[in-house]
């Protein structure tokens, strides 16, 4: 919105030309989303408390979590609101990537909202039935995959690139659609599984989004892409504005979500953020790098899969409790220690992911 307005006004005042720079708009996107989150956060928490939208805590989980019962949840709506407002203010409306990411993020957020609402307002512990949850996730995931496949303007947009290797790209054909679907839906649910401790999911999401913002900027710039031997995706740079909005909104939310949390993001936030990260990684052709940078999300998901498989096959559990962050809690680690150590691991993995841009 402001991008187009500035484009019009620069004919009369040359100073508005500064808003044509992607880096300027990305920085403003961070600050705008951060400001919105910090300003609206207290009001959102107060409203959720008044509406009795409180988190229900499992009785079979760590006993230290019982004190969290009743903490306002569905705070992910605050993150999404700040993200969307900031993105719409500073991005180029004519960019197809911006719209597909916004729409998919909104759909996954809506699925999470319904799931949270049924759990909290309707007192239904199961929330939205799993079949319906995955049905709507699949609709959005496949829809995005088909759209990107059909609108691809260059072979690189549907090729699979292998990190650490120069000029290694695999033509996927129609398999691109299936692959994209699994990246989007898989990342969405992986972030959701990670969201079990105060600030545990949001900070890694912020770190990964920040890295993806840089990658999107480089992938959308022909000279940088050529120099780094990464896929050049025309228009992908505009996703840096979206990713920066996620960073700002996430940091603002963390202000209230840090231990001890005043609000939880709920499925409305976790599912949406995961889908957004997965889709951006697909567009900029860095799915494997996302797998590296989001290693904590992968670890949490694998721990659940192994736990379920082991119990069904042998009747024994590998971990004291899954996802794995609960395992460490039951071993005696204080919650803040688990959180910060997982953050540190994510920071290291993000740096490794960014290193793949140069080490080829």
Curated annotation (Swiss-Prot):
One of its GO terms (molecular function) is phospho-N-acetylmuramoyl-pentapeptide-transferase activity. It catalyses: UDP-N-acetyl-alpha-D-muramoyl-L-alanyl-gamma-D-glutamyl-meso-2,6-diaminopimeloyl-D-alanyl-D-alanine + di-trans,octa-cis-undecaprenyl phosphate = di-trans,octa-cis-undecaprenyl diphospho-N-acetyl-alpha-D-muramoyl-L-alanyl-D-glutamyl-meso-2,6-diaminopimeloyl-D-alanyl-D-alanine + UMP. Its EC number is 2.7.8.13. It is a multi-pass membrane protein. It is an enzyme of class 2 (transferase). The chain crosses the membrane at residues 25-45, 74-94, 97-117, 134-154, 168-188, 199-219, 236-256, 263-283, 288-308, 339-359. Keywords: Cell cycle, Cell division, Cell inner membrane, Cell membrane, Cell shape, Cell wall biogenesis/degradation, Magnesium, Membrane, Metal-binding, Peptidoglycan synthesis, Transferase, Transmembrane, Transmembrane helix. Belongs to the glycosyltransferase 4 family. MraY subfamily. This is Phospho-N-acetylmuramoyl-pentapeptide-transferase. The lineage of its organism: Bacteria, Pseudomonadati, Pseudomonadota, Gammaproteobacteria, Cellvibrionales.
């Amino acid at each position: 919105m402001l991008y187009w307005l500035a484009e019009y006004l620069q004919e009369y005042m040359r100073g508005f030309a500064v808003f044509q720079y992607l880096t300027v708009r990305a920085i403003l996107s961070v600050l705008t989303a951060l400001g919105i989150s910090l300003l609206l956060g207290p009001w959102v928490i107060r409203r959720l408390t008044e509406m009795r939208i409180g988190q229900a805590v499992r009785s079979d989980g760590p006993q230290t979590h019982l004190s969290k019962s009743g903490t306002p949840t569905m705070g992910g709506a605050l993150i999404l609101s700040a993200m969307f407002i900031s993105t719409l203010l500073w991005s180029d409306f004519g960019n197809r990537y911006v719209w597909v990411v916004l729409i998919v993020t909104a759909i996954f957020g809506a699925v999470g909202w319904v799931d949270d609402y049924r759990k909290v307002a309707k007192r239904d512990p199961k929330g939205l039935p799993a079949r319906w949850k995955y049905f709507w996730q699949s609709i959005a995931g496949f829809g995005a995959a088909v759209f990107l496949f059909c609108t691809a303007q260059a072979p690189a947009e549907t090729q699979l690139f292998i990190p650490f290797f120069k000029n290694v790209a695999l033509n996927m054909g129609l398999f691109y659609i299936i692959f994209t679907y699994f990246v989007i839906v898989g990342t969405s649910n992986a972030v959701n599984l990670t969201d079990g401790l105060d600030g545990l999911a949001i900070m890694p999401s912020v770190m990964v989004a920040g890295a993806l913002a840089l990658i999107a900027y480089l992938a959308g710039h022909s000279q940088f892409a050529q120099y780094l031997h990464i896929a050049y995706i025309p228009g992908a740079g505009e996703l840096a504005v979206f990713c920066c909005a996620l960073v700002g909104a996430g940091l603002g939310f963390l202000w209230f979500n840090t231990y001890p949390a005043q609000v939880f993001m709920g499925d409305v936030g976790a599912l949406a953020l995961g889908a957004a990260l997965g889709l951006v990684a697909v567009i900029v052709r860095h799915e494997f790098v996302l797998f590296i940078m989001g290693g904590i999300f992968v670890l949490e998901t694998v721990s659940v899969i192994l736990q379920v498989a082991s119990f069904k096959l042998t009747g024994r559990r590998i971990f004291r409790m899954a996802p794995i962050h609960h395992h460490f809690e039951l071993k005696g680690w204080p919650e803040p220690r688990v959180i910060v150590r997982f953050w540190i691991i994510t920071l290291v993995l993000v740096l490794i992911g960014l290193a793949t841009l140069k080490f080829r």
